Amino acid sequence: MEKDTELHCSFCGKEQKHVSKLIAGTSGYICNECIELCHDMLLSDAVETPEVESTEQQKLPTPHEIRAHLDDYVIGQDYAKKVLSVAVYNHYKRLRSDKQITDVELGKSNILLIGPTGSGKTLLAETMARMLNVPFAMADATTLTEAGYVGEDVENVLQKLVQSCDYDVERAEQGIIYIDEIDKITRKSENPSITRDVSGEGVQQALLKLIEGTVASIPPQGGRKHPQQEMLRVDTSKILFICGGAFAGLDKVIEKRVHVGSGIGFSAEVKSKQDKATLSQLFEQVEPDDLMKFGLIPEFIGRLPVVAPLAELDEEALVKILTEPKNALIKQYQALFSLEDVALEFSPEALTAMAKKALARKTGARGLRSIVEAILLDTMYDLPSLQHLEKVIVEASTITDNQPPTLVYKA
Protein backbone atom coordinates (compact mmCIF):
# COMPACT_ATOMS: atom_id res chain seq x y z
CA MET A 1 0.00 0.00 0.00
CA GLU A 2 2.86 2.37 0.83
CA LYS A 3 4.32 1.75 -2.62
CA ASP A 4 1.07 2.76 -4.34
CA THR A 5 0.84 6.08 -2.46
CA GLU A 6 4.54 6.99 -2.92
CA LEU A 7 4.89 10.19 -5.03
CA HIS A 8 6.88 9.78 -8.28
CA CYS A 9 8.00 11.79 -11.35
CA SER A 10 5.41 11.68 -14.13
CA PHE A 11 8.22 11.78 -16.77
CA CYS A 12 10.90 9.29 -15.63
CA GLY A 13 8.89 7.41 -12.98
CA LYS A 14 11.48 7.81 -10.21
CA GLU A 15 10.08 7.90 -6.68
CA GLN A 16 10.44 10.98 -4.45
CA LYS A 17 13.01 9.31 -2.20
CA HIS A 18 15.33 8.68 -5.19
CA VAL A 19 15.52 12.34 -6.36
CA SER A 20 16.57 15.63 -4.74
CA LYS A 21 13.39 17.55 -5.61
CA LEU A 22 9.91 16.72 -6.85
CA ILE A 23 7.80 19.64 -8.13
CA ALA A 24 4.02 19.32 -8.22
CA GLY A 25 1.87 20.39 -11.18
CA THR A 26 -1.91 20.39 -11.73
CA SER A 27 -2.00 16.73 -12.74
CA GLY A 28 1.46 15.31 -12.06
CA TYR A 29 5.02 15.78 -10.82
CA ILE A 30 8.44 16.45 -12.35
CA CYS A 31 11.80 15.77 -10.70
CA ASN A 32 14.91 17.96 -10.67
CA GLU A 33 16.78 15.52 -12.94
CA CYS A 34 14.15 15.79 -15.70
CA ILE A 35 14.16 19.60 -15.37
CA GLU A 36 17.97 19.65 -15.80
CA LEU A 37 17.73 17.33 -18.81
CA CYS A 38 15.09 19.54 -20.46
CA HIS A 39 17.21 22.62 -19.76
CA ASP A 40 20.25 21.03 -21.45
CA MET A 41 18.15 20.07 -24.49
CA LEU A 42 16.77 23.59 -24.87
CA LEU A 43 20.24 25.08 -24.45
CA SER A 44 21.73 22.85 -27.17
CA ASP A 45 18.88 23.81 -29.55
CA ALA A 46 19.59 27.48 -28.92
CA VAL A 47 23.30 27.02 -29.67
CA GLU A 48 22.56 25.14 -32.91
CA THR A 49 20.17 27.86 -34.15
CA PRO A 50 22.22 30.21 -36.37
CA GLU A 51 22.19 33.77 -35.13
CA VAL A 52 21.57 36.72 -37.44
CA GLU A 53 24.88 38.31 -38.29
CA SER A 54 25.49 41.68 -36.72
CA THR A 55 26.37 44.64 -38.92
CA GLU A 56 30.01 44.31 -37.89
CA GLN A 57 30.13 40.60 -38.85
CA GLN A 58 28.62 41.14 -42.30
CA LYS A 59 30.92 41.72 -45.26
CA LEU A 60 31.10 45.43 -45.98
CA PRO A 61 30.30 46.08 -49.66
CA THR A 62 32.81 48.14 -51.62
CA PRO A 63 31.86 51.54 -53.10
CA HIS A 64 31.51 49.83 -56.51
CA GLU A 65 29.10 47.25 -55.04
CA ILE A 66 27.09 49.94 -53.23
CA ARG A 67 26.84 51.95 -56.46
CA ALA A 68 25.73 48.86 -58.44
CA HIS A 69 22.95 48.19 -55.92
CA LEU A 70 21.78 51.81 -56.06
CA ASP A 71 21.67 51.54 -59.88
CA ASP A 72 19.11 48.73 -59.53
CA TYR A 73 16.63 51.00 -57.77
CA VAL A 74 17.55 54.62 -58.58
CA ILE A 75 17.76 56.03 -62.10
CA GLY A 76 20.39 58.66 -62.91
CA GLN A 77 22.09 60.77 -60.21
CA ASP A 78 25.50 59.25 -61.04
CA TYR A 79 27.54 61.88 -59.20
CA ALA A 80 25.39 61.67 -56.04
CA LYS A 81 25.60 57.86 -56.07
CA LYS A 82 29.39 57.96 -56.24
CA VAL A 83 29.63 60.50 -53.40
CA LEU A 84 27.18 58.49 -51.27
CA SER A 85 28.89 55.15 -51.95
CA VAL A 86 32.28 56.45 -50.81
CA ALA A 87 30.87 58.28 -47.76
CA VAL A 88 28.83 55.30 -46.53
CA TYR A 89 31.73 52.88 -47.09
CA ASN A 90 34.11 55.14 -45.15
CA HIS A 91 31.57 55.55 -42.31
CA TYR A 92 31.13 51.81 -41.70
CA LYS A 93 34.83 51.17 -42.28
CA ARG A 94 35.48 53.72 -39.50
CA LEU A 95 33.14 51.85 -37.12
CA ARG A 96 34.90 48.55 -37.79
CA SER A 97 38.40 50.01 -37.50
CA ASP A 98 37.82 51.72 -34.14
CA LYS A 99 39.28 48.69 -32.37
CA GLN A 100 42.27 48.50 -34.76
CA ILE A 101 43.31 52.18 -34.96
CA THR A 102 44.10 53.80 -31.62
CA ASP A 103 46.52 56.62 -32.50
CA VAL A 104 44.24 58.44 -35.01
CA GLU A 105 40.61 59.40 -34.51
CA LEU A 106 38.68 59.08 -37.77
CA GLY A 107 36.10 61.81 -38.39
CA LYS A 108 32.40 61.16 -38.96
CA SER A 109 31.11 61.58 -42.53
CA ASN A 110 27.51 62.75 -42.24
CA ILE A 111 25.92 63.57 -45.59
CA LEU A 112 23.92 66.48 -47.03
CA LEU A 113 21.79 65.72 -50.12
CA ILE A 114 20.84 68.77 -52.19
CA GLY A 115 18.33 68.36 -55.00
CA PRO A 116 14.85 69.27 -56.29
CA THR A 117 11.64 67.64 -55.04
CA GLY A 118 11.20 64.10 -56.39
CA SER A 119 14.83 63.69 -57.50
CA GLY A 120 15.45 60.60 -55.34
CA LYS A 121 16.98 61.86 -52.06
CA THR A 122 14.78 59.75 -49.76
CA LEU A 123 14.95 56.72 -52.07
CA LEU A 124 18.75 56.80 -52.05
CA ALA A 125 18.87 56.82 -48.24
CA GLU A 126 16.25 54.04 -47.91
CA THR A 127 17.94 51.85 -50.54
CA MET A 128 21.30 52.30 -48.83
CA ALA A 129 19.94 51.23 -45.42
CA ARG A 130 18.14 48.23 -46.92
CA MET A 131 21.28 47.04 -48.69
CA LEU A 132 23.43 47.32 -45.56
CA ASN A 133 20.69 45.71 -43.42
CA VAL A 134 20.87 48.44 -40.78
CA PRO A 135 18.04 50.14 -38.85
CA PHE A 136 16.59 53.16 -40.65
CA ALA A 137 14.46 56.07 -39.43
CA MET A 138 13.17 59.12 -41.24
CA ALA A 139 12.07 62.49 -39.87
CA ASP A 140 10.69 65.71 -41.31
CA ALA A 141 12.69 68.73 -40.15
CA THR A 142 9.63 70.99 -40.45
CA THR A 143 7.92 69.16 -37.54
CA LEU A 144 10.92 69.52 -35.21
CA THR A 145 11.22 72.19 -32.52
CA GLU A 146 13.52 72.83 -29.58
CA ALA A 147 12.76 70.88 -26.40
CA GLY A 148 10.04 72.56 -24.36
CA TYR A 149 8.18 74.05 -27.33
CA VAL A 150 5.07 72.78 -29.14
CA GLY A 151 6.18 70.26 -31.75
CA GLU A 152 8.42 67.20 -31.97
CA ASP A 153 11.67 67.20 -29.97
CA VAL A 154 14.81 66.31 -31.93
CA GLU A 155 15.35 63.35 -29.54
CA ASN A 156 12.18 61.80 -30.99
CA VAL A 157 14.16 61.12 -34.17
CA LEU A 158 16.46 58.88 -32.14
CA GLN A 159 13.47 57.19 -30.51
CA LYS A 160 12.13 56.24 -33.98
CA LEU A 161 15.44 54.58 -34.86
CA VAL A 162 15.53 52.54 -31.64
CA GLN A 163 11.88 51.53 -32.15
CA SER A 164 12.68 50.34 -35.69
CA CYS A 165 14.97 47.62 -34.27
CA ASP A 166 12.83 46.62 -31.26
CA TYR A 167 14.84 48.69 -28.76
CA ASP A 168 18.12 46.90 -29.54
CA VAL A 169 20.39 49.85 -28.66
CA GLU A 170 23.60 48.24 -29.96
CA ARG A 171 21.97 47.62 -33.35
CA ALA A 172 20.42 51.10 -33.41
CA GLU A 173 23.90 52.60 -32.99
CA GLN A 174 24.81 51.09 -36.39
CA GLY A 175 21.79 52.67 -38.09
CA ILE A 176 21.00 55.50 -40.50
CA ILE A 177 18.77 58.51 -39.77
CA TYR A 178 17.44 60.55 -42.70
CA ILE A 179 16.18 64.07 -41.96
CA ASP A 180 14.17 65.50 -44.85
CA GLU A 181 13.30 69.15 -45.61
CA ILE A 182 16.45 70.31 -43.81
CA ASP A 183 16.40 73.49 -45.91
CA LYS A 184 13.16 74.53 -44.16
CA ILE A 185 14.94 75.08 -40.81
CA THR A 186 17.29 77.77 -42.09
CA ARG A 187 17.44 80.94 -40.04
CA LYS A 188 15.55 83.91 -41.37
CA SER A 189 18.64 86.12 -41.88
CA GLU A 190 22.42 85.75 -41.98
CA ASN A 191 22.84 87.74 -38.76
CA PRO A 192 22.14 85.91 -35.47
CA SER A 193 18.86 87.09 -33.97
CA ILE A 194 18.28 88.06 -30.35
CA THR A 195 14.73 86.66 -30.58
CA ARG A 196 14.06 82.93 -30.25
CA ASP A 197 13.71 81.01 -33.53
CA VAL A 198 12.40 77.66 -32.23
CA SER A 199 11.74 76.07 -35.63
CA GLY A 200 14.76 77.44 -37.56
CA GLU A 201 18.16 78.17 -36.05
CA GLY A 202 16.95 76.71 -32.74
CA VAL A 203 16.39 73.30 -34.34
CA GLN A 204 19.79 73.44 -36.02
CA GLN A 205 21.36 74.05 -32.60
CA ALA A 206 19.36 71.18 -31.08
CA LEU A 207 20.38 68.80 -33.89
CA LEU A 208 24.07 69.71 -33.61
CA LYS A 209 24.87 67.47 -30.63
CA LEU A 210 22.95 64.50 -32.04
CA ILE A 211 24.66 64.71 -35.43
CA GLU A 212 28.23 65.25 -34.20
CA GLY A 213 27.97 62.50 -31.58
CA THR A 214 26.68 62.42 -28.03
CA VAL A 215 25.24 59.92 -25.55
CA ALA A 216 21.52 60.67 -25.58
CA SER A 217 18.90 59.34 -23.16
CA ILE A 218 15.57 58.07 -24.47
CA PRO A 219 12.64 56.40 -22.67
CA PRO A 220 12.56 52.57 -22.60
CA GLN A 221 9.97 50.56 -24.52
CA GLY A 222 6.47 51.57 -23.46
CA GLY A 223 7.75 54.80 -21.86
CA ARG A 224 8.88 55.34 -18.29
CA LYS A 225 6.44 53.80 -15.83
CA HIS A 226 7.96 55.73 -12.91
CA PRO A 227 10.59 58.50 -12.51
CA GLN A 228 13.20 56.09 -11.11
CA GLN A 229 13.11 53.83 -14.19
CA GLU A 230 16.39 53.87 -16.14
CA MET A 231 16.51 55.59 -19.53
CA LEU A 232 18.16 53.94 -22.55
CA ARG A 233 21.57 55.44 -23.40
CA VAL A 234 22.33 55.74 -27.13
CA ASP A 235 25.73 56.78 -28.54
CA THR A 236 24.98 58.82 -31.68
CA SER A 237 28.64 59.06 -32.75
CA LYS A 238 28.20 55.75 -34.61
CA ILE A 239 24.90 56.67 -36.29
CA LEU A 240 25.09 57.96 -39.87
CA PHE A 241 22.98 61.09 -40.38
CA ILE A 242 21.82 61.98 -43.89
CA CYS A 243 20.07 65.33 -44.33
CA GLY A 244 18.22 66.27 -47.50
CA GLY A 245 16.44 69.27 -48.94
CA ALA A 246 15.40 70.97 -52.18
CA PHE A 247 17.22 74.22 -51.28
CA ALA A 248 15.13 76.27 -53.72
CA GLY A 249 17.03 79.47 -54.45
CA LEU A 250 20.46 78.11 -53.49
CA ASP A 251 21.40 78.00 -57.18
CA LYS A 252 20.98 81.80 -57.31
CA VAL A 253 23.36 82.17 -54.35
CA ILE A 254 25.99 79.99 -56.04
CA GLU A 255 25.41 81.71 -59.38
CA LYS A 256 26.04 85.09 -57.81
CA ARG A 257 29.32 83.85 -56.35
CA VAL A 258 30.74 82.17 -59.46
CA HIS A 259 29.36 84.84 -61.82
CA VAL A 260 27.78 82.28 -64.14
CA GLY A 261 25.77 84.08 -66.78
CA SER A 262 26.03 87.38 -64.91
CA GLY A 263 25.22 90.42 -66.96
CA ILE A 264 22.54 92.85 -67.90
CA GLY A 265 20.15 93.28 -70.80
CA PHE A 266 20.15 90.43 -73.33
CA SER A 267 22.67 88.29 -71.42
CA ALA A 268 20.30 88.20 -68.43
CA GLU A 269 17.57 86.75 -70.64
CA VAL A 270 19.91 84.05 -71.97
CA LYS A 271 20.85 83.16 -68.38
CA SER A 272 17.21 82.60 -67.36
CA LYS A 273 16.70 80.18 -70.24
CA GLN A 274 19.71 78.16 -69.12
CA ASP A 275 18.75 78.03 -65.42
CA LYS A 276 17.35 74.48 -65.54
CA ALA A 277 20.23 73.16 -67.63
CA THR A 278 22.83 74.49 -65.18
CA LEU A 279 21.04 73.65 -61.91
CA SER A 280 22.97 70.42 -61.23
CA GLN A 281 26.24 72.03 -62.37
CA LEU A 282 25.70 74.88 -59.92
CA PHE A 283 24.84 72.50 -57.06
CA GLU A 284 28.10 70.61 -57.75
CA GLN A 285 29.99 73.86 -57.06
CA VAL A 286 28.28 74.52 -53.70
CA GLU A 287 30.57 75.70 -50.91
CA PRO A 288 30.00 76.11 -47.15
CA ASP A 289 29.76 79.88 -47.60
CA ASP A 290 26.81 79.44 -49.99
CA LEU A 291 24.96 77.31 -47.42
CA MET A 292 25.64 79.94 -44.75
CA LYS A 293 24.15 82.64 -46.97
CA PHE A 294 21.14 80.37 -47.51
CA GLY A 295 20.57 80.19 -43.75
CA LEU A 296 22.40 77.20 -42.28
CA ILE A 297 24.60 78.04 -39.30
CA PRO A 298 28.38 77.38 -39.68
CA GLU A 299 28.47 74.74 -36.91
CA PHE A 300 25.67 72.77 -38.58
CA ILE A 301 27.39 72.91 -41.99
CA GLY A 302 30.59 71.66 -40.34
CA ARG A 303 28.78 68.53 -39.09
CA LEU A 304 27.75 67.63 -42.68
CA PRO A 305 31.12 67.44 -44.48
CA VAL A 306 29.92 65.31 -47.42
CA VAL A 307 27.68 67.15 -49.89
CA ALA A 308 25.97 65.17 -52.67
CA PRO A 309 24.05 67.25 -55.23
CA LEU A 310 21.21 65.66 -57.21
CA ALA A 311 20.14 66.77 -60.68
CA GLU A 312 16.60 67.65 -61.73
CA LEU A 313 15.05 64.66 -63.52
CA ASP A 314 14.23 65.14 -67.20
CA GLU A 315 11.59 63.41 -69.33
CA GLU A 316 13.89 60.56 -70.37
CA ALA A 317 14.86 59.82 -66.75
CA LEU A 318 11.20 59.77 -65.63
CA VAL A 319 10.31 57.26 -68.38
CA LYS A 320 13.18 55.03 -67.19
CA ILE A 321 11.99 55.35 -63.59
CA LEU A 322 8.59 54.03 -64.67
CA THR A 323 10.02 50.89 -66.28
CA GLU A 324 13.64 50.05 -65.40
CA PRO A 325 14.23 49.74 -61.61
CA LYS A 326 13.64 46.38 -59.90
CA ASN A 327 10.59 47.81 -58.15
CA ALA A 328 9.51 50.09 -61.03
CA LEU A 329 5.95 51.44 -60.83
CA ILE A 330 4.85 49.79 -64.07
CA LYS A 331 6.20 46.41 -62.87
CA GLN A 332 4.29 46.80 -59.58
CA TYR A 333 0.96 47.44 -61.31
CA GLN A 334 1.59 44.66 -63.83
CA ALA A 335 2.13 42.29 -60.89
CA LEU A 336 -1.16 43.48 -59.32
CA PHE A 337 -3.06 42.84 -62.56
CA SER A 338 -1.41 39.43 -62.99
CA LEU A 339 -3.04 38.35 -59.71
CA GLU A 340 -6.34 38.66 -61.62
CA ASP A 341 -4.80 36.82 -64.63
CA VAL A 342 -4.88 40.02 -66.68
CA ALA A 343 -1.93 41.49 -68.62
CA LEU A 344 -1.24 45.22 -68.35
CA GLU A 345 0.54 47.08 -71.15
CA PHE A 346 1.65 50.70 -71.57
CA SER A 347 2.50 52.11 -74.99
CA PRO A 348 5.77 54.08 -75.28
CA GLU A 349 3.67 57.18 -75.98
CA ALA A 350 1.73 56.64 -72.76
CA LEU A 351 4.96 56.48 -70.74
CA THR A 352 6.16 59.72 -72.33
CA ALA A 353 2.81 61.40 -71.62
CA MET A 354 3.03 60.42 -67.93
CA ALA A 355 6.58 61.77 -67.70
CA LYS A 356 5.48 65.07 -69.27
CA LYS A 357 2.57 65.33 -66.82
CA ALA A 358 4.91 64.81 -63.84
CA LEU A 359 7.28 67.46 -65.20
CA ALA A 360 4.40 69.92 -65.63
CA ARG A 361 3.36 69.35 -62.01
CA LYS A 362 6.98 69.86 -60.87
CA THR A 363 6.69 66.82 -58.58
CA GLY A 364 9.51 64.77 -60.13
CA ALA A 365 9.42 61.00 -59.67
CA ARG A 366 7.25 61.37 -56.56
CA GLY A 367 4.25 62.41 -58.69
CA LEU A 368 4.37 59.39 -61.01
CA ARG A 369 2.50 57.03 -58.67
CA SER A 370 -0.48 59.37 -58.30
CA ILE A 371 -0.66 59.71 -62.11
CA VAL A 372 -0.63 55.91 -62.67
CA GLU A 373 -3.11 55.39 -59.82
CA ALA A 374 -5.52 57.95 -61.29
CA ILE A 375 -5.55 56.50 -64.82
CA LEU A 376 -6.03 52.91 -63.58
CA LEU A 377 -8.51 53.62 -60.76
CA ASP A 378 -11.72 52.80 -62.66
CA THR A 379 -10.15 49.74 -64.30
CA MET A 380 -8.93 48.37 -60.95
CA TYR A 381 -12.38 49.02 -59.46
CA ASP A 382 -14.08 46.91 -62.15
CA LEU A 383 -11.29 44.35 -62.63
CA PRO A 384 -12.45 41.63 -60.17
CA SER A 385 -15.96 41.75 -61.68
CA LEU A 386 -14.95 41.57 -65.36
CA GLN A 387 -15.24 38.10 -66.87
CA HIS A 388 -12.87 36.77 -69.58
CA LEU A 389 -10.71 39.92 -69.57
CA GLU A 390 -7.28 39.14 -71.02
CA LYS A 391 -5.40 42.43 -71.39
CA VAL A 392 -5.55 46.13 -70.47
CA ILE A 393 -3.71 48.56 -72.78
CA VAL A 394 -2.93 52.14 -71.73
CA GLU A 395 -2.40 54.57 -74.63
CA ALA A 396 -1.30 58.22 -74.59
CA SER A 397 -4.94 59.34 -74.95
CA THR A 398 -5.66 57.80 -71.53
CA ILE A 399 -3.33 60.36 -69.97
CA THR A 400 -3.84 63.39 -72.22
CA ASP A 401 -7.59 63.11 -73.00
CA ASN A 402 -8.84 61.08 -69.99
CA GLN A 403 -9.89 58.24 -72.31
CA PRO A 404 -10.40 54.85 -70.60
CA PRO A 405 -7.75 52.16 -71.23
CA THR A 406 -8.44 49.61 -73.98
CA LEU A 407 -9.85 46.33 -72.65
CA VAL A 408 -9.10 43.13 -74.60
CA TYR A 409 -11.26 40.07 -73.89
CA LYS A 410 -10.50 36.40 -74.51
CA ALA A 411 -11.93 35.04 -77.75
UniProtKB/Swiss-Prot annotation:
Entry keyword annotation includes Ribosomal protein: no
Q: Which InterPro entries match?
A: AAA+_ATPase, ATP-dep_Clp_protease_ClpX, ATPase_AAA_core, Clp_ATPase_C, Clp_protease_ATP-bd_su_ClpX, ClpX_bact, P-loop_NTPase, Znf_CppX_C4
A single BP term in Gene Ontology: cell division
Q: Which GO terms describe its cellular component?
A: HslUV protease complex
SMART domains xrefs: AAA (SM00382), ClpB_D2-small (SM01086), zf-C4_ClpX (SM00994)
Provide the binding site for ATP.
116-123
Query: Organism's domain of life?
Result: Bacteria
Q: Which GO terms describe its molecular function?
A: ATP binding; ATP hydrolysis activity; ATP-dependent protein folding chaperone; protein dimerization activity; unfolded protein binding; zinc ion binding
Q: Which residues make up the binding site for Zn(2+)? A: 9, 12, 31, 34
**Domain annotation ClpX-type ZB: ranges:** 1-50
For whether the record's keyword set contains NAD, the answer is no
What keywords are annotated for this sequence in UniProt? ATP-binding, Chaperone, Metal-binding, Nucleotide-binding, Zinc
In terms of Pfam families, this protein maps to: AAA_2, ClpB_D2-small, zf-C4_ClpX
Please give the coiled-coil regions recorded for this protein: none
> Family assignment?
Belongs to the ClpX chaperone family.
Q: What is this protein's function per UniProt?
A: ATP-dependent specificity component of the Clp protease. It directs the protease to specific substrates. Can perform chaperone functions in the absence of ClpP.
Query: What's the subunit arrangement here?
Result: Component of the ClpX-ClpP complex. Forms a hexameric ring that, in the presence of ATP, binds to fourteen ClpP subunits assembled into a disk-like structure with a central cavity, resembling the structure of eukaryotic proteasomes.
Q: What is this protein called?
A: ATP-dependent Clp protease ATP-binding subunit ClpX
Q: Which organism is it from?
A: Pasteurella multocida (strain Pm70)
Record lineage: Bacteria, Pseudomonadati, Pseudomonadota, Gammaproteobacteria, Pasteurellales
Q: Which gene encodes it?
A: clpX
